[in-house]
Regions:
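N-terminal Rossmann-like NAD(P) cofactor-binding subdomain of oxidoreductases
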Residues: 1-88
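C-terminal substrate-binding/catalytic lobe of Rossmann-fold NAD(P)-dependent oxidoreductases
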Residues: 58-61, 66-188
């Protein structure tokens, strides 16, 4: 830290052992570290959902797919990419399969999930809002109603202002400007 900078927060997964905090997962463990990571937008959407499921039912294993709006690293027109030809394809008109660090980063904010999550990403031609499709095997035998009730309870209690539930059949455009980290569709 130089030139008067007292703290640094970066919104990307740390590639080293930099402390990582996500609201709705482990932010209460922040102890004043000068340099911290807030993980990624996908991790911020995944972590509160995974925490509720793990705390209430226990997660044995999980697979997440983020359906992610295109990013500034994608070209508007097809172009060459050094490592992955698909990442060079136009972000504005293609579904682009790629990787995500969120499945790995989740273990930094929810250590109980270390080695239990895997993931992938699909970048899609929308300018804003992303979605996480999370499939888990739980330690408990549950019904859809049990899971819905757990999210509803969390959204009104421990995760109020962080996680919400959607009972209005909204689509991506309806979430532009959404302040919650995650909104769980109650109809699926």
């Amino acid at each position: 830290l130089e030139n008067g900078v007292k703290k640094v927060l970066f919104s990307a997964p740390a590639k080293d052992d930099t402390a990582t905090f996500v609201i709705g997962a482990n932010a209460d463990e922040y102890a004043g570290e000068a340099i911290v990571s807030n993980a990624s937008c996908t991790t911020n959407g995944l972590a509160p959902v995974a925490k509720v499921l793990d705390d209430v039912f226990g997660i044995e294993k999980g697979l997440m797919t983020t359906i992610h709006s295109y990013t500034s690293s994608q070209p508007i027109l097809d172009a060459k990419h050094k490592k992955d030809p698909r990442k060079g394809r136009s972000g504005a008109v293609n579904l682009v399969p790629t990787t995500t660090g969120a499945a790995k980063a989740i273990s930094k904010v929810l250590p109980s999930l270390a080695g239990k999550m895997n993931g992938q990403a699909i970048r899609v031609p929308t300018p804003d809002v992303s979605m996480v499709d999370l499939t888990v095997t739980l330690n408990a035998s549950v019904t859809v109603e049990d899971v819905q009730a757990a999210f509803k309870t969390a959204s009104e209690g421990s995760h109020k202002g962080i996680l919400g539930v959607d009972e209005e059949y909204r689509v991506s455009q309806d979430f532009v400007g959404e302040e919650l980290s995650a909104v769980v569709a109650q109809d699926t």
